[in-house]
Amino acid sequence: MKIAKSVLAALGLLALNGPVSGQSSNEVVITGVRFAYPIVEKWISDYKAINPQANIRIENRTITDPQKYDLLIEAYELNKEPKEKREYVSLGRYALLPVANAKSVFAKEYSEKGLTEKTYKQLFFHDIYAEKDKALPENYTVYTRLQKAGAPVTFAKYFGYEQQQIKGKSIAGADEHLIKALLKDETGVTYTTIGLAYDAKTGQTVEGLTVIPVDLDGNGKVSKEEKALGNREAWITALESQKVKNVPVEYIHFSIDRQNTNPEAKKFLLWVADNAEKDLHNFGYLKGESGRLTEDKEKLESLLRK
């Protein structure tokens, strides 16, 4: 009788406390880099249209990741340690472009001049040894991220620096907060993704921003053709069709812990790997290098069979 009462008491506690993980058995929690949320929301919507029983949600990342999640989105090249514990799918690539407040003196001048590597380094980085461009206007304000994040890490690494060497006003929050700060400051300059620089519906530059042209072939000057990349599709076409310089590009990685036992999370991730590519351009992403996604899918399928 005592044993029966103990079992009933234990079951009662479980009912009150719920699952240890805090998630229902078929709930999938996604977190990670916030500028990827719009395209992830599209994937969730499309997946639920054919799997209406699915319970998938995004939990916003703050300074740290949520305590419990199934899938993680990252936007920089990861080191060896996390790769040993997680299975990664590289879904597409994002590119970083210089932008300025459209009313700024900087935008008016450099929408014509464009940025070379020398100007880029002087504008954005603390480097006493970098070659200087004396023509830079005095009245400009650089904005950058405060916390470690994919975009600033990728941006700095491309030019040979660390994130902490990016100069300017550090803004807490996500990448879109840089854009909000810049739009309020008529001296503002920053770097951002194609998806944030261009309107999602029209593909044209977000109102109030100027995308600054850059020296794509590395010859030290910005040509008429390089200045003519005036919308989202033009940039994507240029970046996918040729090897370019002065545009940092990195993969968006979706990952799952190899010990994760949530079958719906694995199923959704595999579905995304099969269906993600058709949405990339509309959200400002480049397709990945040939063969990489196929290789990642094969590794993921192998994990699912275990």
Please place each PLM-identified region on the residue numbering:
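N-terminal segment of the mature folded domain
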Residues: Q23-F125
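Bacterial Sec-dependent N-terminal signal peptides
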Residues: M1-V28
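Ligand-binding pocket segment of bilobal, Venus flytrap-like solute-binding proteins
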Residues: K148-S223
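Stable alpha-helical elements in mature extracytoplasmic
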Residues: F35-W43, T116-Y120, A151-F155, A174, ...
